[in-house]
Design a protein with these regions (language model features):
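Extended, charge-biased low-complexity segments
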Residues: 1-81, 97-137
């Protein structure tokens, strides 16, 4: 998946209703300026999740090192985030690198059923789009 395709998907899902597309372009630009030019399906899914939520976007530098393609797992489970934001972020992390937790309790938190049950309608749509992005042909 290239950056243009990801931006088109975001445009189709969000249009001009929010700033998702602008935030997504900023994340992709920041990533490429940091020397990481790879926008693959895994990157695309988590970038979309982060761009789709204003709070996650505002905190992305503490969550993800775009230049090194790394996630700070400790920040994902920060109590600063709402249960819905944590659920979206956990889904993004799982789609990015398959992470399912280090303990049985964490594994439950990363379970797709548990994630989807914590999301409202808007965030469920974001989650479904992220899954489509990750597993698209």
């Amino acid at each position: 998946m290239n950056a243009d395709k990801l931006i088109n998907i975001a445009m189709n899902c969000h249009g001009n209703k929010d700033n998702t597309v602008l935030r997504l372009v900023d994340l992709i630009t920041t990533m490429s300026q940091a020397g990481n030019y790879r926008v693959d399906k895994e990157n695309a899914a988590i970038l979309y999740v982060i761009a789709s939520n204003e709070k996650l976007y505002n905190e992305y530098k503490t969550i993800m090192d775009l230049g090194n393609n790394e996630i700070n797992i400790e920040k994902v489970d920060n109590n600063y985030y709402s249960s819905s934001e944590k659920a979206l972020l956990r889904l993004g992390v799982n789609l990015f690198n398959g992470y399912t937790g280090r303990t049985a309790e964490e594994s439950y938190d990363y379970c797709i059923n548990n994630i989807m049950n914590k999301l409202d309608e808007r965030n469920r749509l974001i989650a479904m789009n992220a899954i489509k992005i990750r597993y698209a042909d």
